[in-house]
Amino acid sequence: MSVIQDLQSRGLIAQTTDIEALDALLNEQKISLYCGFDPTADSLHIGHLLPVLALRRFQQAGHTPIALVGGATGMIGDPSFKAAERSLNSAETVAGWVESIRSQLTPFLSFEGGNAAIMANNADWFGKMNCLDFLRDIGKHFSVNAMLNKESVKQRIDRDGAGISFTEFAYSLLQGYDFAELNKRHGAVLEIGGSDQWGNITAGIDLTRRLYQKQVFGLTLPLVTKSDGTKFGKTEGGAVWLNAKKTSPYQFYQFWLKVADADVYKFLKYFTFLSIEEIDAIEAKDKASGSKPEAQRILAEEMTRLIHGEEALAAAQRISESLFAEDQSSLTESDFEQLALDGLPAFEVSDGINVVEALVKTGLASSNKEARGFVNSKAVLLNGKPAEANNPNHAAERPDDACLLNGEHKRFGKYTILRRGKRNHALLVWK
């Protein structure tokens, strides 16, 4: 199966230019292709995964991927289908983000061997270009009429009170020139990107043909949608980042574990490197079993292993199992740090707090009276163990102090998992 056929079977092609010619070229020879990543934050998020993984798929088929980090274009920001003007970031901020994104792209691609991946930064050519050269050598090849007819530009112009600045209007010229420059430097003949990049990609194709009389191609990947209409890649806590310091491996694992049945088989095709035959077999087995599908677990394992590695996957599974177990002794200090980052609602507490106060503070009970009822009915656990009276000498006027949280409840001298019922948790972080 060719790489184009594989992408088609996974539903990963939204638009292409001359797909028959592209497929023939890919079957006849090994090519160089690229995808651009503008630094708009200090980390990539799962919305970037499709193009990153597409580069990897092409490399596995023997082609040379180029990861282009937009050190220059990131100073402006892509206006494509954005409702309003982007805020501009300082050169120092963008430079820091460039380095972060470069390091995050590295694990996905192999930078050794015959088709070693290439890392590029468009600041290398735009940083040396002056305004007159840009207007004379690049601008003359672009039609303002054609630019105004791009759907992404028309939407901004037609939106009341919006409009578009010349800075953002000129963005497609910069991205278009990236293609021409990478064609000249590295022989790139294919640009891939998200479906919102079609206008920018075709601008680069046109410019490269005009400058170098080369046939080059574009391919876009689909917008990832969820069956319930909500935005993919967002949780109540915000974006799901690839950086473990922004989204913990545990939370990352949980995100994939919670994918709806209606989406999970599509996402297995989109995001994993399991074969279509393997995915179809998983779906058939799930539908025949009549019990809880295995697909979500497989998806969560594949994605967490791919992004964070085997150790992080093991930690995510350990945390997931321990939260609902009586024995939580297997949790490491690093596991608790993940929970404190984003795994559980975390609350700072001080010595002397009792379990009733802790339940109210964390919102696991709405009042002291309700909290006492939970404690008396044995519905409250501390690190997996039932909360029990441990302070027989408490003051008569403070009956709730019969169960004080103390050193025996502190894991690593800092953490206590408070649980009410089967699924309601909070993490106490001791000052």
Curated annotation (Swiss-Prot):
Primary enzyme class: ligase
InterPro entries tied to this protein: aa-tRNA-synth_I_CS (IPR001412), aa-tRNA-synth_Ic (IPR002305), Rossmann-like_a/b/a_fold (IPR014729), S4_RNA-bd_sf (IPR036986), SYY-like_C (IPR054608), Tyr-tRNA-ligase (IPR002307), Tyr-tRNA-ligase_bac-type (IPR024088), Tyr-tRNA-ligase_bac_1 (IPR024107)
Chain positions recorded as ATP binding sites: K234
Listed EC numbers: 6.1.1.1
Similarity annotation: Belongs to the class-I aminoacyl-tRNA synthetase family. TyrS type 1 subfamily.
Key words of the record: Aminoacyl-tRNA synthetase, ATP-binding, Cytoplasm, Ligase, Nucleotide-binding, Protein biosynthesis, RNA-binding
Assembly, per entry: Homodimer.
One of the GO biological process terms: tyrosyl-tRNA aminoacylation
'HIGH' region, short sequence motif: residues: 39-48
Naturally occurring in which organism (per UniProt): Neisseria meningitidis serogroup C / serotype 2a (strain ATCC 700532 / DSM 15464 / FAM18)
Residue ranges of every copy of the S4 RNA-binding domain listed in the record: 353-422
Localisation: Cytoplasm
Chief subcellular location: cytoplasm
GO cellular component: cytosol
Motif ('KMSKS' region): 231-235
Catalysed reactions listed for this entry: tRNA(Tyr) + L-tyrosine + ATP = L-tyrosyl-tRNA(Tyr) + AMP + diphosphate + H(+)
Protein name: Tyrosine--tRNA ligase
Function: Catalyzes the attachment of tyrosine to tRNA(Tyr) in a two-step reaction: tyrosine is first activated by ATP to form Tyr-AMP and then transferred to the acceptor end of tRNA(Tyr).
Molecular function in Gene Ontology: ATP binding; RNA binding; tyrosine-tRNA ligase activity
Gene name in the database record: tyrS
